[in-house]
């Protein structure tokens, strides 16, 4: 069953076509003035301009045709040519029934579902994740959930940073501490121990030590450069260490990502495509796209139509090494060649400050024919800022670790729950579980509710509140609906068939009707805040419904059964939508 808005749009489009006008003028949406109408169609004004006719005349004829539609209670012309529509109680009742029993809670699969790779996360091996990783993780994971739900075949890839200078820092610092390790014997080629010689704590100590030394000593930095060059060239001991570093890091990363309910299909890194680079470079040469410049190999990607400077892609630098341009291109090649189903598009959820890099890479990929340039999308986002409007930092001015941010969220969630009226029989384990869900809801929703491309100010006290536009508020709204249904069941009352008769019921069903449009809008525009807005509106509509009408306490049995069924539909859509945002709802709180 399609949404009422979509159904009415199709009917209005057909009415415009019957008048010899384009169907696109028939778009119907929720009314800006709910006191006057449920839906509105504004297409008559644009159609009149195109046809050279009076807009009210066109609107009048369209309204007359729409009055014949089974769902329409009234169709009236207002102002210069607006068409105001009221739908029948029967149509709303049928729609609510469908939402309640539908696996997609009233949404529909996308007509343009595609095989999609979503590249997000981008954590670095041996480096702790920081607050800057929050947005990529949360936005990327939400997009993969939304896209899968809408019918896309999605493969998500964390795309680890495991091939840069930090690897050289680790190797050399480990050598300084334990020079006798077999990995440093250049004459030895294996086999190497299965157990890593380092822990995640070791990596967290070794890297900053080496990095600080390298910043103060050019010779020390040169040692790291030499070590990473030897690693990239295939030195067995260093490659074995790399595998250990990656293995240890992934275990730790899975904990950080897991806390946020973030998952990946692939845990690949830059090093996984190293073997493809020589062949890739040769392809660029054979295609006549690569040329030498000051000892480096570059690809010009600038176009005459460019209105900004577009530097060339650096395939191979003057020292013979490769960088992010090359590994990103090799990763595209790897995905196109090795994934079970060939990708039709790739989305890169990365800080918008990397826009130039991705534009260069996408152009080069298109020029070589790896994939059409317009099938590659950079999903950029703004920064997480402190109260001063600058990127969020610790009190000491350092970068805040993601694990510390999560601990802060847990502490604030516990504080909020301590002030709440929790069930007396709630044990420590359940309380901890609820606190974690509140913390995750706060972190994820506070990020997702903002337009992706904007910066936002991080305010943990506000984000963990059970009031206002927050994740915990939406979670509590869903729990409250579940509580109403549970208590009704305990008193022997069950849901029946939805029969809409009251204004508060109508408003609630009209909000339920918009879920599919919000879902597909969030998917199409890569903007999760669209779904957040819908769910917040639904929670508010239920709150108004709950305040206006008795539900389980309704004396009339049929009305009670109807309202319980409507509440169950709200529960279903709220939980479904929150799951798409990566927010789990507890049974009680």
UniProtKB/Swiss-Prot annotation:
Q: What family is reported?
A: Belongs to the class-I aminoacyl-tRNA synthetase family.
- Species annotation: Hyphomonas neptunium (strain ATCC 15444)
Catalytic activity, EC: 6.1.1.19
Disulphide bridges: none
The stretch of residues making up the signal peptide is none
User: What keywords sit in the KW lines?
Assistant: Aminoacyl-tRNA synthetase, ATP-binding, Cytoplasm, Ligase, Nucleotide-binding, Protein biosynthesis
Is Cytoplasm one of the keywords?
Answer: yes
Quaternary structure (record): Monomer.
Major localisation: cytoplasm
Cellular component aspect of the GO annotation? cytoplasm
Gene Ontology MF terms: arginine-tRNA ligase activity; ATP binding
Give the classification, highest ranks: Bacteria, Pseudomonadati, Pseudomonadota, Alphaproteobacteria, Hyphomonadales
The entry's protein name is Arginine--tRNA ligase
- Name the residue ranges of motif: 'HIGH' region: 123-133
Q: What HAMAP family does the record point to? A: Arg_tRNA_synth (MF_00123)
Q: Name where it's found.
A: Cytoplasm
Q: Which SMART domains does the record cross-reference, listed alphabetically?
A: Arg_tRNA_synt_N, DALR_1
Q: Which CDD domains match?
A: Anticodon_Ia_Arg (cd07956), ArgRS_core (cd00671)
What is the catalytic activity of this protein? tRNA(Arg) + L-arginine + ATP = L-arginyl-tRNA(Arg) + AMP + diphosphate
Task: Please give the biological process terms from Gene Ontology that the record holds.
Answer: arginyl-tRNA aminoacylation
